[in-house]
């Protein structure tokens, strides 16, 4: 096989191997849409460990990049007309070893998941000040699969919260697409969990899904 024309491939490999030596397990790494833009996904972990991993990851990226004559930038919007860089946060909850976001026998979303999503959406405007703390954070919103509106959907990447396809019930999770890597991950994860738990405690009702692409929707659809 011919290797892809991706100059970052070897750098990503070095980053992933370094992370593994530090007991951080990357699940995938690949070139993203923008020039010089790369993505690394981690294996799930408890919130505090995940936040620690984000800090370690940023330092590893900058160190390995510099070693290869490159600069590792975590700017949410480094180029005005190109895709920005987010930090999508995947969340699932377990009780007694069972994923309580797992769908029921009929495939319906669990009440716990629905209320958790409702809680995060209700607090999204306030949380945004912490998950997206710099001016470039807001330049990223509204294009190239970055959300603009407080909405959720199954699979649609234009929404603030997406429910990814799960190969089995135990992998059910939500993906919060608002945060970027300029945030403090300890605050970001704590606020997202607190908002979700508030939704569960208050048994908040989840609004209807927004199944269409919000980047191309007309004004009437957004009312």
Each language-model region and where it sits:
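Glycine-rich, acidic/polar active-site loops that bind/position phosphate-bearing ligands
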Residues: 1-223
